Amino acid sequence: MTSTSIPTFPFDRPVPTEPSPMLSELRNSCPVAPIELPSGHTAWLVTRFDDVKGVLSDKRFSCRAAAHPSSPPFVPFVQLCPSLLSIDGPQHTAARRLLAQGLNPGFIARMRPVVQQIVDNALDDLAAAEPPVDFQEIVSVPIGEQLMAKLLGVEPETVHELAAHVDAAMSVCEIGDEEVSRRWSALCTMVIDILHRKLAEPGDDLLSTIAQANRQQSTMTDEQVVGMLLTVVIGGVDTPIAVITNGLASLLHHRDQYERLVEDPGRVARAVEEIVRFNPATEIEHLRVVTEDVVIAGTALSAGSPAFTSITSANRDSDQFLDPDEFDVERNPNEHIAFGYGPHACPASAYSRMCLTTFFTSLTQRFPQLQLARPFEDLERRGKGLHSVGIKELLVTWPT
C-alpha cells in the first residue's frame, strides 16, 4: 500500500481459505489504516493482535454509537435492527446474561447427543454418495442448518430461508442498500414470528428458554430480544458451514495432519483451536464508533470515527504466534481470539467447540482416507460479502 492509497474492502483473496494478503501488508506496515467500505465511506481498520484486543475491550469504541440513527451508514444493515453487536453497557450485559441462561453447561450437555446424531446422519449421506462429491453441499450445509434448527426449535427449511436472507444482506457490496434493507426486513419479520410462536408454545430449545426467561424477568423489550436472536442467527448458520468446510480443506491440504487425527482422536480438541484460528469466517468485524479522541498504535482517531477490527489478521500476528501462517493441529500455546474478546466475545464459544470437536472426531474416524478431489489451488471463493469467507464448493473423494 502506498502512502496515498486507501484499500477498498472487500479485499482480494487469491486463496479462498487464506486471509487477504492486504491484511498482512497492513499489519506489517500500517496497523491502524483507513479503508474504503462498500458504502463509499472511510473507516479505520485495526489489524495487530494486541491492538485488536485493546479495541475490543475499550469502552471508548462503541457498538451502540455505530448503530445510532445519526451515524452515517458505514455498513447499512447495522442500523436496520439492533443486535448484540450494536449495543453496549447494561443493555448488552442484560442481553448476554439472558442468552447465557440458554447456553449453560447443562444445555450443552443435553445437546451433545443431538449434535452427534446430526453429524452421524450427514456422514451417512456422505457414505451413501458416489465420490467425488461436494462436501459442503452434502455435509457442511445440512449440519449447519440442522444445528440452528435445533437451537431455535424450527424446521431446517425455515433455517434455510433465514440463511438466504442473512447471506444476501451481508453481500452489501453486490446487491445494494435497497435490497439489503428488504432482506433485513424479511429476516426481522421471520424472527419476530418465530419468537411469538415460542412464547405461545414453548419447546425444549434455546429460543424457548430465552423467550420464557425474558417474560418472567422482563429484562429486555421484544425488539431487543429479536436483536439478540438475530445475532444468534447471523453467527450460527453461515459461520459453522464456513468453518467446517474451510477447516476440512486445510486438513486435507495438509494430509499428514489429517492423518494425525485419524490415528489419535484425542488430538481433535486441540486441532479445533487451530482450525478456528487459521480458518476465519470473517475478515473484518465489530464495527464501532470512537466516542472520544484516542490513540492506537501511534495513530490518532478522533471522536466519531468508525473503526473495525480484524480478528483474522490478529490471529496471524507473528508477535503472538510462532510461524502464524503455518497450519499446525498441535500448536501449543494457541491463545487465539477467534471467538472474539472482551464484552462482545462470542457467548456460544463452548457450544461451538463441542460441535466442531464432535464433527471432526466423527469425520476422521469414519473417513480415514478422505482426500481432495481437485487441487487445493483450484478452490473458489463463495461471494464477496462482509461476513462469510467460505468456499464455493469442496470436492472430496475416498476409496470405495
Swiss-Prot record:
UniProt membrane topology term: Multi-pass membrane protein
Location (main, coarse): membrane
Gene Ontology cellular-component terms listed: plasma membrane
GO molecular function terms noted in the UniProt entry: heme binding; iron ion binding; monooxygenase activity; oxidoreductase activity, acting on paired donors, with incorporation or reduction of molecular oxygen
Domain of life according to the entry: Bacteria
Transmembrane segments: 225-245, 294-314
Keyword list, A-Z: Cell membrane, Heme, Iron, Membrane, Metal-binding, Monooxygenase, Oxidoreductase, Transmembrane, Transmembrane helix
Cofactor: heme
Location within or outside the cell: Cell membrane
Binding site for heme: 346
EC number(s) from the headed UniProt entry: 1.14.-.-
SUPFAM superfamilies per the UniProt record, alphabetical: Cytochrome P450
PANTHER family, alphabetized: CYTOCHROME P450 BJ-1, P450, PUTATIVE (EUROFUNG)-RELATED
Family: Belongs to the cytochrome P450 family.
The protein's name: Putative cytochrome P450 141
Provenance organism: Mycobacterium tuberculosis (strain CDC 1551 / Oshkosh)
Taxonomic path: Bacteria, Bacillati, Actinomycetota, Actinomycetes, Mycobacteriales
